[in-house]
Structures are given as C-alpha cells and as structure tokens.
C-alpha cells in the first residue's frame, strides 16, 4: 500500500518536471525551434485549431522558421495567428510557405524571458511539493486506519522527501540551462 503511494508520487513528480520542461520550451530564445509555435491556435473553418494540425513547422536556419500550410486557403489565418501571438514575430508569405525570421533578442527582452522562465520553474517546484504533501497525507491516513506503523510513516516521509529533492533539483537544472541559453547572444 505504501509502496503504491510512493510509486504514484514519483510518477506524478516526473510528470511535473516534464510539464515544466515543456512550458520552458515555449519561451523564445535567440535560436529557431519548431516548439516556439506550439502554443499558437489558428482559426480554421471557424474552429480554434493548433498550428501543428494545419501546417508543418520546420527550421530553415538558426534564425528562421518555415511554416508550410497544408491548405492554401488557411495561409491568411495562420499568418494572422502568428502575428497576433505574444512572440513578436512577423511572418513573410512565399506561396504555401511562411518564412518567419526571428529578431535578435534585446537585453531587456532577455531579462523578461528569464523572469518568465523562473516563474515557470517555481510553478514546477510548487507542483512537486503539492505531490509530496498529497503522498504524505495518504500515508498518514493509513497510519490512522492502523494499516501501518509510525516507523513506516516516518520512513515513507523520508523517501518521499528524497524524491521531492531529486525532482526539484531536475527543475533547477532545466532552469539553469534555459537561463544560459537565453543569455547567449
């Protein structure tokens, strides 16, 4: 019973780390990466659709993304969605393909992005700590139901804390790597 709780906590903490990593991938650095456009929704035949379902996003070079739209009639909608996003991008139309040059980041914009990334990391840490709290409360419920001993509870709390520390360390490593990536010119 306690093993299941610990295993579940570890899986959920891993998912928190993955979610944090995915959120940080959306933050624009100086380099072109297809995941920059993952959060963009396109109005396609009256329905909000993720960009990757109406177009293929690729990298032309380190500062240019190319978006090949599957349906030529959706080019204007895709272009409008990219321009109205908060990424500050201006696509250039070339037939069924949109080329998106990525402007160099200013120092001020880099610092703003670092604040965003740090906030995402803190949200990840909070989620991991919430999983820890849930796991420990589940173990304490077992103790109240006389399904385990006080020593088992203490041992479980220590193990869950080790999982928590390890996963928070992963989030911190991801944050450090992203900050370095953002500060590269």
UniProtKB/Swiss-Prot annotation:
Keywords of the record: Cytoplasm, Protein biosynthesis
GO BP terms in the entry: cytoplasmic translational termination
Domain of life, source organism: Bacteria
Protein's UniProt keywords contain Transcription: no
Main function: Responsible for the release of ribosomes from messenger RNA at the termination of protein biosynthesis. May increase the efficiency of translation by recycling ribosomes from one round of translation to another.
SUPFAM superfamilies: Ribosome recycling factor, RRF (SSF55194)
PANTHER family: MITOCHONDRIAL RIBOSOME RECYCLING FACTOR PSEUDO 1, RIBOSOME RECYCLING FACTOR
HAMAP family: RRF (MF_00040)
Listed name of the protein: Ribosome-recycling factor
Species of provenance: Shewanella baltica (strain OS185)
Pfam families, per database record: RRF (PF01765)
Similarity section: Belongs to the RRF family.
Subcellular location: Cytoplasm
InterPro entries: Ribosome_recyc_fac (IPR002661), Ribosome_recyc_fac_dom (IPR023584), RRF_sf (IPR036191)
GO cellular component: a single term: cytosol
GO molecular function: ribosomal large subunit binding
């Amino acid at each position: 019973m306690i093993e299941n709780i610990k295993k579940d906590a570890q899986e959920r903490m891993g998912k928190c780390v993955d979610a944090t990593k995915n959120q940080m991938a959306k933050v624009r650095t100086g380099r072109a990466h297809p995941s920059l456009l993952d959060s963009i929704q396109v109005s396609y035949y009256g329905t909000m659709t993720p960009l990757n379902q109406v177009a293929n996003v690729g990298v032309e070079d380190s500062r240019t993304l190319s978006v090949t739209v599957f349906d030529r009639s959706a080019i204007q909608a895709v272009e409008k969605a990219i321009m109205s996003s908060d990424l500050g991008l201006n696509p250039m139309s070339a037939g069924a393909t949109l080329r998106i040059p990525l402007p160099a980041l200013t120092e001020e914009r880099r610092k703003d992005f670092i604040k965003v990334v740090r906030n995402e990391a803190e949200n990840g840490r909070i989620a991991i700590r919430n999983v820890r709290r849930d796991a420990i409360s589940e173990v304490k419920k077992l103790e109240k139901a006389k399904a385990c001993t006080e020593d088992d509870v203490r041992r479980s709390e220590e193990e869950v804390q080790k999982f928590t520390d390890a996963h928070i360390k992963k989030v911190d490593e991801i944050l450090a790597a992203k900050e370095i990536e953002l500060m590269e010119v």
